[in-house]
Design a protein with these regions (language model features):
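Carboxylate-rich, polar loop motifs that coordinate divalent cations or form catalytic acidic clusters
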Residues: 4, 21-695, 730
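Bacterial N-terminal signal peptides
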Residues: 8-16
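Short, glycine-anchored, charge-dense loop/turn motifs used at functional sites
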Residues: 720-731, 758
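Short beta-strand edge segments in extracellular beta-sheet folds
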Residues: 776-781
Length: 781
C-alpha cells in the first residue's frame, strides 16, 4: 500500500510539470478542409447529418453535438470522394471515390470496404456516376454500364460491362431506368441484362440525372427540374416541369423530396404536387436537407445549422457549427512563424499553368484554425472582379497578423483580420500594367523591408525586383518614389519566380522560373536599402563540383542555411556552398552524393531526376524535400544520407505530389502540403534550446498499455542524454537530435523497464556534470 501511495504522489508531481503534448514520434495526422465555397452534398438522417465539402466527408451527431471528419486514419479506405448516397431504408451511407473504390458507413459508425471495382482491371473508365438502392442492394451506374453491390456482404453481386457510360440509374420494384446515349432507357428487373439490348428506349430523348421518389415516380435534375410519372407502360413516361432551373441539392424527407435553391426550397410529393417555400434573405438555401420535414439543416459558407420557418420567420434550432478546419484544400504555401502555421493556395497549377482559383488563406494557432480570406479588397485590373491566383506569402516579422501576398492580376495585398490594409500595383509603384500586374514571390529581410519579384514579360526596361522599405510599408499614399528598383540588366522573370534572402541579409537570390531558369545573385554588402554598393551576378549555366553541366530547367525552391543555398529543381537538388564565387564567375552548384554503402566507392546524386517542389530545414538542420511525384524525403543535414522516404505506399500520405513543406520552430512537427490537404508528421527532431531549464518528457506517465516511443524535448543541441533508474543504474543513453531525444522504454537488454521513476540527465559532453537531472519519467509496467 505504501508503494502505491508513493507512486501516486510521483504521478501527480510528474503530470504537473508536463506540457500538453501527446502525439507519438512517427505518427501522422491530417488537417481537414472546409472552405465554405465547395459544398457538394448534404444528407439529414435520423441521428446524423452527413455533408460533403471540398471533397471531404463530415458527419454531425445531432444528439451529442459531436462532429466527425472521415479519413483513412479513422477507418476510411481511400481519399478524393466523388459522391455520397444514403440508403434511407437500411440506414447506411455509400461513399464513392474518384478511383472507383467504395466504402459503406454503417449507422453505428463502422466502415466496410467494397474494393472490387477499384481492383478490377478494365480498358475503359470505371468512374461511378450514380447510385440507387433496393433493399441491401446498391445499383451503381458507371462509365462502362452498371453493377449491383450486395451492401450487406460487401461484394459485387452482378456487373454488366456494355462499354457504354450509364450516367444515371434508378431501380423500382419492377424496372431499372438508366440514362445513356442522351436518352432514358428501361428494362424489367426480372429480365436478363447481359446484353445492352435488354434496355428499351423510353419516350424521353434527353440525358438526365434521375432520382427516385418511390416505385411510381422520379425526379430529374439536369437543366430544368422535372417530375416523371411511371405508368403501366414504363417506356411511356409522363414528364412535367417543376422549376425552370436545376436544384443544387435534393434529399428525401419522409415520403417526399426536398429540392434546394439559394432563395427557396421545393417539397415534391410522390403524386407530383409541389410546394415552394421562400427562404429568408439572411439564409443561403443552396444546400438543405430534412429527414422529417420539421427542422431544416442548411450548409453554407459559414457552416452547418438547423432552423425552421413559420410565417416567413426563422427559428434557429441548432446554432451554426463550422468545423475546426483549414480553408485551403491545396496548400501551395506553408509558413510557420511565431507559433502559427499559415497556409495559402497558389495561382498556378502543378504544371505551372495559371488556374484562376480564388485566394484561400488560413492560419493555425494553439490547435484552432482561423479563416483569413480577405472579405473585401480593391480590384483594378481583374475582369473577374474577384481576388484570384495568389503567389507568394510573407508574414510581417513585427506583426504576425499582417499577411502579405502577391497575385497574378493585382500586384500585392496586405491583409489583417480579413481586411485589406495595403495594396501595391501599377497605380502606386514602379510596376507597370500589361494586362496584369503579377508579383510572384515576396520576402521580408531581417530589418523588415519587403522584397518582391515582378513578372516583367521580358521587358527588361522594367526591373524584376523591388524593395519597399520598412518605414513605407503601411504608408497611405504610396508613390513610385517610395520603392527601390533593383536593375538586373536583361534578367527576365515570369510567374512562379523564387526569391530567397539570407538570414544575415547579405545575399538575395532570385530564380527566373523561365525554361533554363537563370539565377540572379545579389550581394547587398549588408546595406539592405542602399543598392549603391551591391554586386550582382547572373548565373545562366550550372556546373557541378566535377565540372559537369547540371541541366536545370526550372528552379522551384531556394532555401538558405548559413549562407549555403539549397536549390530544388525539376531535375534534382543543387547546393551552392560558396556563394561568393558567383561574383568571379566561378560559382559551383554541388550535386550532393549519397554513398551506396554496398562495399564499393560508388554514390548516387541526391534525388537525381526527381522534381523537387519545396525544401524545409528542421531543428536538427536536416533537410526535407517535397517532390512532384514520389513523396517526401528526409536527409541528413548535409544531404549525404537519405534517412526517410515517405509515400502513399508506406505512410498516411494520400498523394505523392508534395506541394509545400514547413517545419515548426517550436517543436518536432513537420507540415506537409499536398494536392489533397495538409498533413502533419511528428518527427524525431526539434529545435534546440540555450539551456536545460525547460526540459520535459511525454507521454508522462507511461502507462502499461503504451508501447511507443518516449520523447524528451527542450534539450540543448546534440546533448548527451543518460537515463537511469532510482538507484543510479544506467538504463539507456544516446545523443539528442537537435533538442529532442527518443527512448523506446527498454533497457540495455531489450526488455521493458520495471515500474518506477526514471531520471533523465543531459549534458553537452561526457565530462560536463553541470546539468544534473533535467526531468523525470514515471513508468508503470
Amino acid at each position: 500500500m505504501i508503494k502505491k501511495i508513493c507512486l501516486a504522489v510521483a504521478l501527480l508531481i510528474v503530470m504537473a510539470v508536463v506540457p500538453a503534448k501527446s502525439q507519438q514520434v512517427g505518427s501522422w495526422s491530417i488537417y481537414p478542409v472546409f472552405s465554405g465555397n465547395n459544398n457538394n452534398s448534404l444528407v439529414d438522417t435520423d441521428n446524423k447529418v452527413f455533408y460533403l465539402a471540398d471533397g471531404w466527408l463530415y458527419s454531425y451527431d445531432k444528439d451529442n453535438d459531436e462532429s466527425v471528419f472521415y479519413t483513412k486514419m479513422n477507418g476510411m479506405s481511400d481519399t478524393d470522394i466523388s459522391g455520397i448516397y444514403y440508403n434511407y431504408d437500411k440506414k447506411f451511407l455509400l461513399v464513392a471515390y474518384s478511383n472507383s473504390n467504395i466504402d459503406i458507413v454503417r449507422e453505428n459508425g463502422r466502415v466496410d470496404n467494397v474494393p472490387d471495382l477499384k481492383s478490377v482491371i478494365l480498358t475503359v473508365s470505371k468512374a461511378i456516376n450514380s447510385v440507387d438502392f433496393s433493399g441491401d442492394y446498391a445499383y451503381i451506374a458507371t462509365d462502362f454500364g452498371y453493377m449491383v453491390v450486395d451492401c450487406n456482404k460487401c461484394v459485387v453481386k452482378e456487373s454488366f460491362n456494355y462499354g457504354k457510360a450509364f450516367k444515371s440509374i434508378v431501380v423500382t420494384d419492377k424496372n431499372i431506368f438508366a440514362t445513356f446515349d442522351k436518352k432514358i432507357y428501361v428494362s424489367s428487373v426480372g429480365e436478363s441484362h447481359y446484353e445492352l439490348s435488354s434496355f428499351k428506349e423510353t419516350n424521353i430523348k434527353q440525358e438526365m440525372k434521375l432520382l427516385k421518389i418511390d416505385n411510381n415516380s422520379m425526379l430529374t435534375t439536369t437543366g430544368w427540374f422535372y417530375y416523371i410519372k411511371i405508368g403501366e407502360d414504363p417506356t411511356n413516361l409522363a414528364m412535367s416541369v417543376i422549376e425552370k432551373s436545376a436544384p443544387s441539392n435534393v434529399s428525401m424527407s419522409g415520403s417526399n423530396m426536398v429540392a434546394s435553391y439559394k432563395e427557396k426550397y421545393i417539397v415534391v410529393s410522390p403524386d407530383g404536387t409541389s410546394q415552394t417555400v421562400a427562404m429568408p434573405s439572411e439564409i443561403d438555401g443552396s444546400h438543405l436537407s430534412t429527414i422529417d420535414g420539421k427542422g431544416l439543416w442548411n450548409l453554407d459558407s459559414k457552416g452547418l445549422k438547423e432552423f425552421s420557418i413559420s410565417d416567413g420567420s426563422v427559428t434557429i434550432l441548432h446554432d451554426t457549427y463550422r468545423p475546426n478546419t483549414s480553408t485551403v484544400s491545396e496548400p501551395y504555401y506553408l509558413t510557420y512563424q511565431n507559433g502559427t502555421l499559415y497556409s495559402m493556395n497558389s495561382g498556378r497549377n502543378y504544371k505551372g499553368a495559371s488556374n484562376g482559383k480564388s485566394v484561400m488563406l488560413s492560419s493555425l494557432k494553439n490547435g484552432v484554425w482561423n479563416k483569413l480570406n480577405p472579405i473585401k479588397v480593391d480590384i483594378h485590373n481583374n475582369s473577374y472582379k474577384s481576388l484570384i491566383e495568389p503567389y507568394g506569402m510573407a508574414i510581417d516579422p513585427f506583426d504576425s497578423e499582417k499577411i502579405w501576398f502577391g497575385s497574378f492580376f493585382e500586384g500585392i495585398y496586405c491583409i489583417k483580420n480579413g481586411k485589406q490594409i495595403q495594396k501595391i500595383d501599377h497605380l502606386n509603384s514602379p510596376m507597370y500594367l500589361d494586362f496584369v500586374v503579377c508579383v510572384s514571390d515576396l520576402k521580408f529581410d531581417k530589418e523588415g523591408n519587403l522584397w518582391f519579384s515582378f513578372y516583367n514579360f521580358n521587358k527588361t526596361t522594367y526591373a524584376p525586383l523591388y524593395i519597399l522599405p520598412k518605414d513605407k510599408l503601411y504608408k497611405e499614399n504610396l508613390t513610385a518614389d517610395d520603392f527601390i528598383s533593383i536593375d538586373l540588366g536583361n534578367f527576365a522573370t515570369t510567374y512562379g519566380s523564387q526569391l530567397c534572402i539570407s538570414k544575415d541579409g547579405r545575399y538575395v537570390l532570385l530564380g527566373s522560373n523561365m525554361w533554363k531558369s537563370k539565377l540572379a545573385i545579389i550581394d547587398t554588402n549588408g546595406t539592405l536599402t542602399d543598392i549603391s554598393d551591391d554586386r550582382v551576378a547572373i548565373v545562366a549555366t550550372y556546373n557541378d563540383q566535377d565540372g559537369k553541366n547540371f541541366d536545370i530547367g526550372y528552379i522551384h525552391s531556394i532555401k538558405e542555411e548559413n549562407n549555403k543555398f539549397w536549390l530544388g529543381t525539376n531535375t534534382g537538388v543543387g547546393l551552392i556552398n560558396n556563394i561568393k564565387a558567383a561574383f568571379s564567375g566561378n560559382v559551383v552548384v554541388n550535386r550532393v552524393k549519397v554513398p551506396r554503402n554496398d562495399g564499393t566507392n560508388l554514390a548516387d546524386y541526391l534525388l537525381d531526376g526527381v522534381s523537387v517542389n519545396d525544401i524545409a530545414i528542421d531543428g536538427a538542420n536536416r533537410k526535407w524535400f517535397g517532390s512532384s511525384t514520389s513523396g517526401l524525403y528526409l536527409t541528413s543535414s548535409d544531404g549525404s544520407e537519405i534517412l526517410e522516404h515517405f509515400s502513399t505506399e508506406n505512410s498516411s500520405l494520400t498523394s505523392d505530389e508534395i506541394t509545400s513543406v514547413a517545419c515548426s520552430t517550436d517543436d518536432n512537427r513537420v507540415f506537409i502540403g499536398t494536392k489533397k490537404g495538409t498533413f502533419v508528421y511528428e518527427s524525431d527532431a526539434a529545435p534546440s534550446q540555450d539551456d536545460y531549464s525547460d526540459v520535459y518528457a511525454y507521454p508522462n506517465p507511461v502507462r502499461p498499455d503504451y508501447s511507443g516511443h518516449i520523447t524528451v524535448a527542450g534539450l540543448m543541441d546534440n546533448s548527451l542524454v543518460k537515463i537511469t533508474d532510482s538507484m543510479g543504474n544506467l538504463v539507456y543513453s544516446g545523443r539528442s537530435t537537435g533538442g529532442m531525444f527518443v527512448w523506446n522504454g527498454l533497457n540495455s537488454e531489450g526488455s521493458r523497464v520495471n515500474t518506477g521513476v526514471y531520471y533523465v540527465f543531459a549534458s553537452q559532453n561526457e565530462n560536463d556534470k553541470s546539468s544534473g537531472c533535467v526531468t523525470k519519467i514515471l513508468v508503470v509496467k
